Swiss-Prot record:
Key enzyme in glycolysis that catalyzes the first step of the pathway by converting D-glyceraldehyde 3-phosphate (G3P) into 3-phospho-D-glyceroyl phosphate. Essential for the maintenance of cellular ATP levels and carbohydrate metabolism. This is Glyceraldehyde-3-phosphate dehydrogenase, cytosolic. One of its GO terms (cellular component) is cytosol. GO terms for molecular function: glyceraldehyde-3-phosphate dehydrogenase (NAD+) (phosphorylating) activity; NAD binding; NADP binding. Belongs to the glyceraldehyde-3-phosphate dehydrogenase family. The keyword Cell cycle does not apply. It catalyses: D-glyceraldehyde 3-phosphate + phosphate + NAD(+) = (2R)-3-phospho-glyceroyl phosphate + NADH + H(+). InterPro entries: GlycerAld/Erythrose_P_DH, GlycerAld_3-P_DH_AS, GlycerAld_3-P_DH_cat, GlycerAld_3-P_DH_NAD(P)-bd, Glyceraldehyde-3-P_DH_1, NAD(P)-bd_dom_sf. It comes from Pisum sativum. Its EC number is 1.2.1.12. NAD(+) binds at R14, I15, D36, R83, N319.
Amino acid sequence: MGAKIKIGINGFGRIGRLVARVALKRDDVELVAVNDPFITTDYMTYMFKYDSVHGQWKNDELTVKDSNTLLFGQKPVTVFAHRNPEEIPWASTGADIIVESTGVFTDKDKAAAHLKGGAKKVIISAPSKDAPMFVVGVNENEYKPEFDIISNASCTTNCLAPLAKVINDRFGIVEGLMTTVHSITATQKTVDGPSSKDWRGGRAASFNIIPSSTGAAKAVGKVLPALNGKLTGMSFRVPTVDVSVVDLTVRLEKAATYDEIKAAIKEESEGKLKGILGYTEDDVVSTDFIGDTRSSIFDAKAGIALNDKFVKLVSWYDNELGYSTRVVDLIVHIAKQL
């Protein structure tokens, strides 16, 4: 194969560290640099090695060479600690594509600061109000080389969009509502605390079911224009640490039995969407999907039809690792046009 794609990561939080794990296990990408102003290299090593959800890193031994370098086995990764993205000298490390995973620089102008340091492309690991959004398996072929800043959308959009695409392509969606029952994330509080923009979101994450807003369903209309204005949704944050589940309730254009819908999803999961969309008829629960790298795993036993035009569909996702794997897939896709 050709030269590896050299990548950098800005923000070594949940997604940043998991993107690093995914990248380090692949032979088509090479992690060359990480920037995080809030953690030292020795603490970075600890946080990467030990993970409460995904377990201990058992691949290459991770050591600190010095305050600016980590060693994964013998492979050096440069570490920066700049608060301002335009100050990060990505070019000095050869990093071509940057994963912007701080959660702070999510619009085009802010993310474009990475280009000043020599990056060629930036992938935002969050929804963006103005950067083009891509969901692998759904619309990544709409990517054009002139797009320097793009978004990998959200974990929930990555779960919902492949499922919605199959249903809309086969049966047509008149309209629909989505609910995601979503694991807690780093923005939530361990005990009741201040959250002026979202009062409910400030309540203790570990023993509440917390209704919340999500733009994930509306964002499907951005990656699948045929569904624009046809879907919206909301979220319940629940006290699990990883894996979430989408409940998509839709009105169909074409009448279909639940068995026909299951067959269509199974066929796509074994065809064009293999590795992205999964299918199971097992009696699964959420922890069964920790570590699953697929974007969306349809639970055939959990869904239900009211009639042949009104149906509830259920699909699981590891909102951390599945999403992080798609970030790397998107890197590989856009690198073909560098």
